[in-house]
């Protein structure tokens, strides 16, 4: 739940257009306006739910906030830092604070890496820990997401979908981020597992003081976890309100 009115993430008139090329010389003949002028704020400690039908641009919005896509136009702020103007090295350092949890737990984990190496990857990349400290941190992270640390030398194929998603969550938490984009993190899971993962997200938010952008199409789950909900349609936000208000007066 939101702690105060402190704005952690601010998005101003965000646009992400993908060019369409045709012909032998690949001339641009148009563009797909995946995100077409989106603006919103996310307060510290809050969960903002972002919902909409497939293809409406919600996942593109999340990926563009993290600069996985370079926006066509608009501004994105984390605290007082404008992400859209950061140089690559500065943006790389910023990724300690902002992380993403992907939709597909089967595709987002390298099948050739052990769970230990997968979770430790951000620690190694940023030099956050070395030697035995890495193993200790991995064990702590596995406990945090309710996985047995004794399984750290196993491979992704030895785990269920729900367990794989927990591994992805542990990896995202490795460098103690403050803002996490959750890109439909439960849509690929069995219904029986979805509630457990949602509860884990809520527990982590309370324990680690996290702020979420929670992208989903399951309205009941979004209502359960979100403080406010934004509804997206054809690249724009058509409604943004408190979760109870938006469900009472859709």
What residue ranges belong to the model's regions?
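A short, proline-enriched helix->beta-strand linker immediately N-terminal to the Walker B motif
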Residues: 174-178
């Amino acid at each position: 739940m939101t702690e105060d009115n402190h704005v952690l993430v601010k998005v101003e008139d965000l646009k992400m257009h993908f060019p369409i090329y045709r012909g032998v010389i690949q001339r641009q003949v148009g563009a797909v306006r995946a995100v077409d002028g989106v603006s919103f704020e996310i307060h510290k400690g809050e969960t903002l739910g972002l919902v909409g039908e497939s293809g409406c641009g919600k996942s593109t919005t999340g990926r563009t906030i993290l600069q996985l896509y370079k926006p066509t136009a608009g501004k994105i702020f984390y605290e007082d830092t404008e992400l859209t103007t950061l140089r690559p090295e500065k943006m790389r350092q910023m990724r300690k604070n902002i992380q993403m949890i992907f939709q597909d737990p089967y595709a987002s984990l390298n099948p050739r890496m052990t769970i230990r190496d997968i979770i430790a990857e951000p620690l190694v990349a940023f030099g956050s820990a070395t030697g035995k400290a890495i193993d200790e941190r991995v064990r702590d992270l596995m406990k945090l997401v309710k996985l047995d640390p004794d399984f750290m030398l196993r491979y992704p194929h030895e785990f269920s979908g729900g367990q794989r998603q927990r591994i992805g969550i542990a990896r995202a938490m490795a460098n103690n981020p403050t803002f996490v984009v959750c890109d439909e993190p439960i849509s690929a899971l069995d219904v029986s597992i979805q509630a457990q993962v949602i509860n884990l997200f809520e527990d982590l938010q309370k324990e680690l003081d996290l702020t979420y952008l929670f992208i989903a199409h399951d309205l009941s789950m979004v209502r359960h976890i979100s403080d406010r909900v934004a509804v997206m349609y054809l690249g724009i936000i058509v409604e943004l309100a408190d979760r109870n208000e938006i469900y009472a007066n859709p």
